From Swiss-Prot:
Keywords: Phosphopantetheine, Phosphoprotein. This is Aminoacyl carrier protein 2. Aminoacyl carrier protein. Can be charged with L-glycine via the formation of a thioester bond between the amino acid and the 4'-phosphopantetheinyl prosthetic group, catalyzed by the bll6282 ligase. SUPFAM superfamilies: ACP-like. It comes from Bradyrhizobium diazoefficiens (strain JCM 10833 / BCRC 13528 / IAM 13628 / NBRC 14792 / USDA 110). Disulfide bonds: none annotated. 4'-phosphopantetheine is transferred from CoA to a specific serine of the apo-form of this carrier protein. Residues 6-84 form the Carrier domain. Gene3D superfamilies: ACP-like (1.10.1200.10).
């Protein structure tokens, strides 16, 4: 895996763990973990989206804010790498 992707994945994992902790959810999170399955609510997802934007200094385009893109750390990683690579945001 490329260093940038590893860095993005680690940062996303950190943000996800922070949101889970703030929502009193204790879970072992892996890149493929389905966040809804480990207990993240829709409000938690909104919080996660905002924290991801802040962490990566991005404004996600509306079309990227989908359940599929926030399904797992891996899905968010792909979306973020795409945004960083496209120079948008």
């Amino acid at each position: 895996m490329h260093n940038t992707a590893i860095n993005v994945q680690n940062r996303v994992l950190s943000v996800v763990r922070s949101v889970l902790q703030q929502n009193a959810i204790s879970a072992d999170v892996h890149p493929e973990s389905r966040l809804v399955d480990i207990g993240l609510s829709s409000m938690g997802m909104v919080e996660l989206m905002l924290k991801v934007e802040a962490e990566f200094d991005l404004i996600l385009p509306q079309f990227e804010i989908t359940p599929e893109n926030f399904r797992s750390v891996k899905a968010m990683e792909r979306m973020i790498l795409n945004q960083l690579g496209s120079g948008s945001g």
